Amino acid sequence: MTFKATVLTLYPEMFPGHLQYSLAGKALERGQWSLDPIQIREFATDRHRSVDDTPAGGGAGMVLKPDVLAAAIDHVSKGDTRPRLLMSPRGKPLSQNRVRELAAGDGAIIVCGRFEGVDQRVIEARGLEEVSIGDYILSGGEPAALTLLDAVVRILPGVMGNDLSGVHESFEGGLLEHPHYTRPQLWEGRDIPAILTSGNHAAIDKWRHEQALALTKERRPDLLEKTQAETK
């Protein structure tokens, strides 16, 4: 099964973007996943190919029209059961758990918002799952979509050279990742922790877990609270 990503956007030239220089780009070349950016404007029906209009009730900015976006969604999703994601700052925060769920599926249809937002009716009528990559505003959904794809594709089977690479990363097991060290042994008066060169793998694993736990307590206590709540 090949992971298939279909991206609805007003800027298809932004894809694959920086992904072509990463593991995701190499995997794309090898056919381990596919990417199909679709121009939303192609589904506009007026002579100006309009995709947006002023917000009902007044206000700043423009809103992506429901008829145009719905036509684009319908075109790419006939008989398609892939999740439909809308990159949106008001969406549910993207988590590593959701990334794993997406990677286990056969792909996703990703809608990149623009302007002030997307007409709420098309969100409801087409069952769009709003997804956020953080509590900040971007100029459009394209950078967010690329971030999501990077997170998903890198954990697809066979993409990382060592399938264990993803096991010890941040958010796996509900913890931030432990610190890393490499040669030289001594650098600017700072030594690699002796435990890491001891050859005692059980002790190394214990040290790494303790470090990950301490970092998580210091920087992201909310992750620990979430993990504790899920295990109750």
From Swiss-Prot:
It is an enzyme of class 2 (transferase). The keyword Transferase applies. One of its GO terms (biological process) is tRNA N1-guanine methylation. InterPro entries: Alpha/beta_knot_MTases, tRNA_m1G_MeTrfase_C_sf, tRNA_m1G_MeTrfase_TrmD, tRNA_m1G_MTases_N, tRNA_MeTrfase_TRMD/TRM10. S-adenosyl-L-methionine binds at G113, I133, G134, D135, Y136, I137, L138. Its EC number is 2.1.1.228. GO terms for molecular function: tRNA (guanine(37)-N1)-methyltransferase activity. One of its GO terms (cellular component) is cytosol. Pfam families: tRNA_m1G_MT (PF01746). It catalyses: guanosine(37) in tRNA + S-adenosyl-L-methionine = N(1)-methylguanosine(37) in tRNA + S-adenosyl-L-homocysteine + H(+). It is found in: Cytoplasm. Keywords: Cytoplasm, Methyltransferase, S-adenosyl-L-methionine, Transferase, tRNA processing. Homodimer. Specifically methylates guanosine-37 in various tRNAs. Belongs to the RNA methyltransferase TrmD family. PANTHER family: TRNA (GUANINE-N(1)-)-METHYLTRANSFERASE. HAMAP family: TrmD (MF_00605). This is tRNA (guanine-N(1)-)-methyltransferase. The gene is trmD.
